[in-house]
A protein has these predicted regions:
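Conserved glycine-rich cofactor-binding loop
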Residues: 9-12
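Conserved Rossmann-fold cofactor-binding substructure of NAD(P)-dependent oxidoreductases
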Residues: 60-75
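Conserved glycine-rich Rossmann-like NAD(P)H-binding loop of the short-chain dehydrogenase/reductase
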Residues: 25-40
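Hydrophobic positions on the long internal alpha-helix
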Residues: 68, 82, 109-113, 117
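Rossmann-fold cofactor-recognition segment
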Residues: 47-63
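A hydrophobic alpha-helix adjacent to the NAD(P)-binding/active-site core of NAD(P)-dependent oxidoreductases
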Residues: 98-99
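Catalytic loop of short-chain dehydrogenase/reductase
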Residues: 87-92, 122-150
Length: 150
């Protein structure tokens, strides 16, 4: 059975760069929300000798993640998941989108793929320093003084 590596946020950036480091004996599935970006990335990988496929997936939607899991398992045994999908304020992400994609999306990907992955398989969640450098619109600074009062 073929070994499958799923990379979320694979249409560009860290996801696509990570795909280029994977062994060429794996089937690579790049996911993201924009098929045109995924198709360009897939063409780039195929030129490098990879067997690669594109699948749109919104990681903030559990049903979309379940569809991705079904697609991935139809191609072989999922051995690796690189979860690099994410947004930041610099990408014009709203607080709601940041929470849905970066937090809930991570949980959905981990939970759904863990159901089908065997021992020895690996899920890697890629993050950024955004967890440590929160944008001002997320931090309720005006509420801090209220916390010191009765």
């Amino acid at each position: 059975m073929a070994n499958v590596c799923v990379i979320t946020g694979g249409g560009s950036g860290m996801g696509l760069a990570t795909a280029k480091f994977m062994p060429k004996d794996k089937i690579i599935i790049l996911t993201g929300r924009t098929m045109s970006k995924l198709e360009n990335a897939i063409n780039e990988l195929k030129e490098l000798g990879y067997e690669a496929y594109a699948k749109t997936c919104d990681t903030s939607d559990r049903e979309s993640v379940k569809e991705l899991v079904a697609y991935a398992t139809s191609l072989g045994e999922v051995k690796n998941v690189i979860n690099s999908a994410g947004v930041s304020p610099a990408m014009k992400g709203t607080p709601e989108n940041i929470l849905r994609i970066n937090a809930l999306g991570t949980v959905y990907v981990n939970q759904e793929f863990a159901k089908v992955m065997k021992p020895g398989s690996v899920i890697v969640d890629v993050s950024s320093n955004s967890a440590y450098v929160l944008p001002s619109f997320i931090i309720p600074k005006k509420a801090y003084p209220l916390a010191e009062t009765n």
